[in-house]
Amino acid sequence: MSSHPPPRKHVNIHELRRMKEAGERIAMVTAYDATAARLVAAAGVDAVLVGDSLGMAVQGHESTLPVTLDQMVYHSAMVRRGLARGDGRAHLVADMSFGSYQASADEAVKAAMRLVAEGGAEAVKLEGGAEFGDVIRRIVRAGVPVMGHIGLTPQSVHKMGGYVVQGKDSEKAQQILRDARALEAAGCYALVLECIPSELARIVTSQLRIPTIGIGAGPHCDGQVLVLNDLLGLDASFTPKFVKRFGELGAAVEGAVGAYVGEVKARAFPDDAHSFHSASVRLVPVERHAEEAEEEPPDAIGAPI
């Protein structure tokens, strides 16, 4: 009898629905490159989001708005390759960048297809409420699963007046609930709820058949998602209220690089153990080499093309 555990089942849109029905929590994180994807997959995440949050976490922008569709395709393809190095279990979702789906349904379908065909994503995520119902229907009819995203939608940061909690009063809470129902009806297979009151997230989750993935939405969602850089503690100066830092990698990286710099300055690195050796290397005096070089014809290094 084999002692190896059975391979873990790939998490697709149907498995996510089953997890909701079974009461199994969904663990999702962001990743932006192959190395991060390989590591989070090995850690056992159920889903990976190639978020346009890379604009802030990787590119150094103040918002997600400058991120382009080409960049999303590029990073998604890297993450797909990283996941392929593991057991291939995690579900891969890519964000649709600002401007890639708002102008027309036709453009949205083309953008979604690129993220799947070129970026290797299994699904796309887009922000917005009922007003994007027709766009979602078109993308789904084209064969691309869509994850919705309501509450705080970072691509609408200027309209919302900043990164603030949404749905705190009765009227806005009702609108979020209406949007959630509309997105489910439009064909979304899952829904991200960002920065809304925990009580509202519980109501939305209980009234939908599709899974809800919370970020800053309390413990009642069917799953949770965090930006990898935040949960790893890579930036000690930025820790939103809803983020729990599960590591302090920022300090660890600074310490490791600082140790490297110190050893280089002290000529302690590289030492003998980190150097290559050969007893058969033929040493040529520098002076002799220079003389031989002067005797070579001018075209010895190759004629210009």
Curated annotation (Swiss-Prot):
UniProt key word NAD: no
Gene3D superfamilies linked: Phosphoenolpyruvate-binding domains
Localization, UniProt: Cytoplasm
Residues bound to Mg(2+): 52, 95, 127
Catalytic activity reported: 3-methyl-2-oxobutanoate + (6R)-5,10-methylene-5,6,7,8-tetrahydrofolate + H2O = 2-dehydropantoate + (6S)-5,6,7,8-tetrahydrofolate
Biochemical pathway: Cofactor biosynthesis; (R)-pantothenate biosynthesis; (R)-pantoate from 3-methyl-2-oxobutanoate: step 1/2
Catalytic residues in the record: 194
Keyword line: Cytoplasm, Magnesium, Metal-binding, Pantothenate biosynthesis, Transferase
Keyword Chloroplast among record annotations: no
EC number of the protein: 2.1.2.11
Cofactor(s) required, per the database record: Mg(2+)
Alphabetical list of CDD domains matching this protein: KPHMT-like
GO cellular component, one term: cytoplasm
Main location: cytoplasm
Amino-acid positions noted as binding 3-methyl-2-oxobutanoate in the UniProt annotation, renumbered to this chain: 52-53, 95, 125
A UniProt-annotated Pfam family: Pantoate_transf
UniProt cofactor note: Binds 1 Mg(2+) ion per subunit.
GO MF, any single term: magnesium ion binding
Biological processes per GO annotation: pantothenate biosynthetic process
Domain of life according to the entry: Bacteria
Assembly notes: Homodecamer; pentamer of dimers.
Family the entry assigns: Belongs to the PanB family.
Protein name according to UniProt: 3-methyl-2-oxobutanoate hydroxymethyltransferase
Organism expressing this protein natively: Anaeromyxobacter dehalogenans (strain 2CP-C)
